[in-house]
Amino acid sequence: MRDDSGPPLEEDQARPPRALPPVPSAIQVCSSFVENNSRMDQQDDLVGEDDIPLSHPKKKKSRTKSSLATASSEGHAEPVVNRRAEGSEPPAAELKEHPEAPAPRRQKKIRPPPELETSLTERPSSPSLLRNENGIDAEPREEAVIPKPRRKAKKTQPAEPQYASELGVEDEDILTDEQSTLEHHSRFTAPTGVSQPVGKVFVEKSRRFQAADRSELIKTTENIDVSMDVKPSWTTRDVALSVHRAFRMVGLFSHGFLAGCAVWNTVVIYVLAGDQLSNVSNLLQQYKPLAYPFQSLLYLLLALSTVSAFDRTDFAKISVAIRNFLALEPTALASFLYFTALILSLSQQMTSDRIHLYEPSVNGSLWAAEAEEPILVPWIIVNLVVALLVGLSWLFLSYRPGMDLSEELMFFSDVDEHPETGTKASP
């Protein structure tokens, strides 16, 4: 209800136009379109019956439901309906005044081309005349909306790594074979094709990739592996172990050579002395040039053989060595026999010197008359015992030539501490 308490306005005095609220651009276009339709309806009423072609019946263009729904949702549907009703009043009055005249037909409105409709919808809202309650056209107060130009988003291309300066392209790097076109796969799916081996491979040399034949590359890698296997890195332990094994082989040779020399020495002595040592003077005269060289060689071989035999025995643990000797262990027995033979050979070294200096006419004090036999008999017996001891030692060591207890102690002590590994010392 309107408040009528205010002073009444005079009929002759026109009311000032009331300012309407700003209308959105879409609603404004819709209202202008409705106003144009109402004006065209008024013009159609004024046209005569003869001017309207009969072949074209009147068709009333209905508004789209979407425009009415949009107008009603924005709250401006009532003004549009009221304006439509006001615009339709004059034709009804004329029909009442002239009831006999036939109802005039309206002309078919020509639909503007799509270019104009597009320009009409895209054009910014122009100030249109709207009618207020008194029927006076008034311009709505609305700020012109300037459409903002849309900027097309440019796709950022990933920066390509600049490796052209570092990696050069050579003629041999370019493959002349026909290359099949690669199918475009999605980024996150693995290719389903099976890779085929290529005859050429690219190897980086001095910060550049060079083409090389696959077969030649495989040969070079195999040669490198073989050379690495042939020349392993040696440690101090490996050198000591190799020297120890080499000396063991030399000692084994000296054992056999010493046994042969001792037996030969004994045979020569008994042959030169005759039966029952009856010709001692002949022994002294014939054995004189052989005394020094042969006794020196015999002493050298005895020393090497004794050290080699001791090297095979574990003397770091005295109790273990004594137990092995009492158990008649071959290496322990050979060591004891060689040491005994060396002591006996040294005990008869003075007699060997006297044999070397045998001259009855010059050195009569060294060899007195009838004193030759008592001096030579012990020397002959000692040489016989040395030959027997050396021969037995050689037989004991020949029974087990690869046995070396000191090697197991010095180089394979970690194997003894962890017997569960099942590793044994190599001979």
Swiss-Prot record:
Task: Tell me which family the UniProt entry assigns to this protein.
Answer: Belongs to the TMEM237 family.
Compositional bias of kind Basic and acidic residues: 75-87
Give start-end positions of Polar residues composition bias.
Answer: 28-40, 118-131
Residues of the region (Disordered) are 1-172
Q: What is this protein called?
A: Transmembrane protein 237
State the oligomer form and interacting partners.
Part of the tectonic-like complex (also named B9 complex). Interacts with TMEM107.
The terms describing its cellular component in GO are: ciliary transition zone; cone photoreceptor outer segment; microtubule cytoskeleton; nuclear speck; photoreceptor connecting cilium; plasma membrane; rod photoreceptor outer segment
Under the heading InterPro entries, the entry gives: TMEM237 (IPR029409)
Q: Which gene encodes it?
A: Tmem237
Give the source lineage, highest ranks first.
Eukaryota, Metazoa, Chordata, Craniata, Vertebrata
Ordered alphabetically, the record's keywords are:
Cell projection, Cilium, Cilium biogenesis/degradation, Membrane, Phosphoprotein, Transmembrane, Transmembrane helix
Subcellular location(s) of the protein: Membrane; Cell projection, Cilium
Q: Which residues carry this modification: Phosphoserine?
A: 25, 72
